[in-house]
Design a protein with these regions (language model features):
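Short glycine/serine/threonine-rich phosphate/pyrophosphate-binding segments
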Residues: 13-15, 39-43, 68-70, 121-127
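Short, flexible, mixed-charge acidic loops at enzyme active sites
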Residues: 16-22, 70-77
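A glycine-rich helix N-cap at a beta->alpha junction
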Residues: 71-96
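N-terminal beta-strand-loop-alpha-helix module at the start
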Residues: 1-63
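Glycine-rich phosphate-binding loop signature in dinucleotide/nucleotide-binding domains
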Residues: 105-110
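Short Gly/Thr/Asp-enriched flexible loops that form oxyanion-binding sites at enzyme active sites
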Residues: 123-135, 139
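Single conserved hydrophobic/aromatic residue that forms the stacking wall/gate
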Residues: 140-149
Length: 149
């Protein structure tokens, strides 16, 4: 069984954010970035399932600027087998990200797709639901880990 896990690069949760002077967003220059914490949880659960012998491969995917590859590297460091980085410049809306993920899912053909419950940078909780609709697949929304695997 192959598990694909989407991971997002966000401003680290310990950073006190500052709004740009023109009010168009938050300052990200020289700000510590990290993997979205709920996505860390998704990677961790996927790796645990693989370690229990219930999955054969965990693939981490991120969509974002060049530096977003750091999130894939972190996923590899904790046990993902492969990583995919779709490089895009600028900020994408959740539907655009969902459409990119749809193409990856169509190509990779995973048995499961894990995503964190929401991103801490926007709290929208839209990408997973949109991806589910685009793929015409069922969605298990905000599940709790079950033990044992």
């Amino acid at each position: 069984m192959k598990i694909l896990v989407a991971v997002k690069r966000v401003i680290d949760y310990n950073v006190q954010i500052r709004v740009k002077e023109d009010g168009t967003g938050v300052v990200t220059d020289n700000v510590k970035m990290s993997t979205n914490p709920p996505d860390d949880n998704a990677i961790e659960e996927a790796v645990k399932i693989k370690e229990a012998g219930k999955a054969t491969e965990v693939v981490a995917i991120t969509v974002g600027e060049e530096k977003a590859q750091e999130t894939v590297r972190k996923a590899l460091a904790v046990g993902a087998d492969r990583g995919i980085h779709v490089k895009v410049d600028g900020i994408l809306e959740p539907l655009a990200v969902s459409k990119i993920l749809q193409k990856i899912v169509d190509k990779e053909k995973p048995d499961l797709v894990f995503m964190g419950k929401q991103a801490i940078d926007d709290d929208c909780n839209q990408t997973g639901q949109m991806l589910s609709a685009l793929l015409n697949l069922s969605l298990i929304h905000i599940s709790e880990p079950t033990r044992p695997y």
